[in-house]
Amino acid sequence: MIDEMMKRATLFINEFHAINDFDKDVFVKEVDRTPSQMIAYQLGWINLILSWEQDNKDGKHVITPTENYKWNNLGGLYQSFYDQYAACSLETLIERFQQDVHKIIQLVESYSDQELFEPGGRQWATSTPANWPVWKWIHINTVAPFKSFRTKIRKWKKMKGQ
């Protein structure tokens, strides 16, 4: 899982090195997010997982995705991610992404196999009827979007002639 996360994270973030900071907020018709929004989305989910874990360690009951956003309002949650990172340069977003991926890898390494792979490993992972094991929450919010958003940024670059 960690190897795949590192591989997908690297492939995803390396796509941004050739993008000029002036273009970070440019929409192209064929892609639903700007380059900065693509990274902000990843940062938002990674940091939600990290905050869920910290809140559990602090004895707090976690409500997913957040107390302010429910699963039927993910558009509002995504907008909050974009707003949170809107003032950041592309270079800063890339650096934060790399740092936060390192943090999520450290988190995965800290789990026992039982905590990671069996349902009920963490309270926050049992907060929906699906009762997924922790690994699935992490995979769906890291590896999977790293892969799908790499396709998006490659399409964005192609449409921009980069």
Question: Where are the regions a protein language model picked out?
Answer:
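Short, contiguous, pocket-lining structural segments
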Residues: 1-8, 30, 96, 141, ...
